[in-house]
Amino acid sequence: MGMRMMFIVFLLVVLATTVVSFTLDHVLGLASEGRNAKAIDNALDQRDPKRQTPGCCWHPACGKNRCGRR
């Protein structure tokens, strides 16, 4: 293998590693963020009876209906 071919293989390995790493971080990060938001929201609901509205999520990271908040 020539020097140019080795450099191209190196670049392809770096690119593939970066793409896989970013994809896994993105997918796993969103999943864990949603679980954490739900756990935080449930804990807050237990402490504050005014927040116990079905279908609402008061945590900013939650993707559900935010019950009229801006």
Curated annotation (Swiss-Prot):
Residues 22-51 form a propeptide. Residues 1-21 form the signal peptide. It holds the Pfam family Toxin_8. Expressed by the venom duct. The modification Hydroxyproline is found at residue 54. The modification Cysteine amide is found at residue 67. InterPro entries: Conotoxin_a-typ. It is found in: Secreted. Keywords: Acetylcholine receptor inhibiting toxin, Amidation, Cleavage on pair of basic residues, Disulfide bond, Hydroxylation, Neurotoxin, Postsynaptic neurotoxin, Pyrrolidone carboxylic acid, Secreted, Signal, Toxin. The modification Pyrrolidone carboxylic acid is found at residue 52. Disulfide bonds join 56-62, 57-67. GO terms for cellular component: extracellular region; host cell postsynaptic membrane. GO terms for molecular function: acetylcholine receptor inhibitor activity; toxin activity. The cysteine framework is I (CC-C-C). Belongs to the conotoxin A superfamily. Alpha-conotoxins bind to the nicotinic acetylcholine receptors (nAChR) and inhibit them. This peptide potently blocks muscular nicotinic acetylcholine receptor (CHRNA1-CHRNB1-CHRNG-CHRND), and has no effect on neuronal receptors. It is able to totally displace [125I]-Bgtx from the Torpedo receptor with an inhibition constant (Ki) of 2.2 and 0.7 nM. This is Alpha-conotoxin EIIB. It comes from Conus ermineus.
